[in-house]
Regions:
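N-terminal active-site segment of His-dependent metallophosphoesterases
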Residues: 17-82
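Hydrophobic beta-strand anchors of alpha/beta hydrolase catalytic cores
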Residues: 27, 66, 137, 173-174
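Active-site glycine-centered loops adjacent to acidic/histidine catalytic or metal-binding residues
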Residues: 32, 70-71, 103-104, 140, ...
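Extended active-site neighborhood of metal-dependent phosphoesterases/phosphodiesterases
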Residues: 79-172, 193, 197-214, 225-263
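Short acidic, glycine-rich surface-loop motifs adjacent to enzyme active sites
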Residues: 167-185
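Acidic, His/Gly-rich catalytic cores of divalent-metal-dependent hydrolytic chemistry
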Residues: 257-276
């Protein structure tokens, strides 16, 4: 059984498991390793070197878990890219759960039935929900929302609301996805980088209704922070191919009973230990 499928079992189990304690902890988010992008699918050697350094950092910091918010590979049909990404994940300590979510490149842009089926064969799941220390963490397949895969998206929406309803006694509800709901403004027009406005409004209203505090996303390949009322969207830079001014790096998120605190660190600026 592969490393990622092992954690699928954990994810399913944790949907129904609750935790009484509220001790602070931290997790790591990284996004868009996109194996193959740097050399236009001719090689992924540069991504491998970067991700091996990231693994060393993760193993040293020993976070509660790691979330990779999509675009694991540049070409979702390139088995070599997929295999290398999965190999890198196996280098992370076995006691650190690793959760992944699909990006548009993983599903070949259109999120067809075939691409979703292939993704599920490789990773075992395309969304997740678990509780840890009285906080609820939910990961969505955002490419199917973007691509308007109506039937699949509706099923996911029902699943999402059910899990939000079941988490009302939690201190926090935190969402993960590849696409941010919007890039600059909640009412901005549809574009490649955001969720279409018709669907966007549904999800933003749901975030408000169930008091979701944070979303951590990727896709843009640069860092940004946006808000919709009390709902905060944090977009994290690509770990391998930044398109903005920030260095490649990771986001460390500290979860306290009464607040969420997060910082982005360039790969050469990450502290050797984290103080809570």
């Amino acid at each position: 059984m592969s490393r990622l499928l092992v954690y699928l079992v954990t994810v399913i189990f944790c949907v129904t498991k609750t935790f009484a304690q509220s001790e602070p902890f931290y997790f790591i988010q990284l996004s868009d390793p996109q194996f193959g992008m740097l050399e236009k699918n001719k090689s992924f050697s540069q991504e491998t070197k970067i991700m091996e350094k990231v693994v060393a950092v993760i193993n040293n910091l020993n976070p509660a878990f790691v979330v990779i918010t999509g675009d694991m590979v540049n070409d979702g049909e390139d088995q070599n890219q997929i295999n290398e990404f999965k190999r890198i994940c196996t280098l992370i300590k076995k006691n650190i759960p690793v959760y992944v979510l699909p990006g548009n490149h993983d599903l070949n842009q259109q999120s067809t039935d075939e691409s979703i089926s292939c993704y599920m064969d490789e990773y075992g799941y395309d969304c997740f929900c678990f509780h840890l220390n009285n906080s609820c963490f939910i990961g969505l397949n955002t490419p199917i929302i973007f691509a308007n895969r109506e039937e699949k998206e509706k099923k996911q929406l029902v699943w999402l609301e059910k899990n939000l309803e079941n988490s009302q006694k939690c201190n926090h509800r935190i969402l993960f996805g590849h696409y941010p709901f919007f890039v600059k403004e909640p009412n901005e027009t549809n574009r490649y980088e955001n969720i279409p406005i018709k669907k966007r409004k549904i999800y933003l209203d749901l975030m408000d209704k169930y008091r979701v505090s944070n979303m951590f996303a990727g896709h843009l390949h640069y860092n940004a922070m946006r808000s919709y009322g009390n709902f905060n969207i944090t977009i994290t830079n690509s770990i391998c191919t930044p398109l903005g001014e920030d260095r490649i790096g990771i986001r460390i998120v500290k979860v306290y009973p009464d607040k969420i605190v997060h910082d982005y660190y360039g790969l050469d600026q990450i502290p050797s230990n984290i103080t809570l």
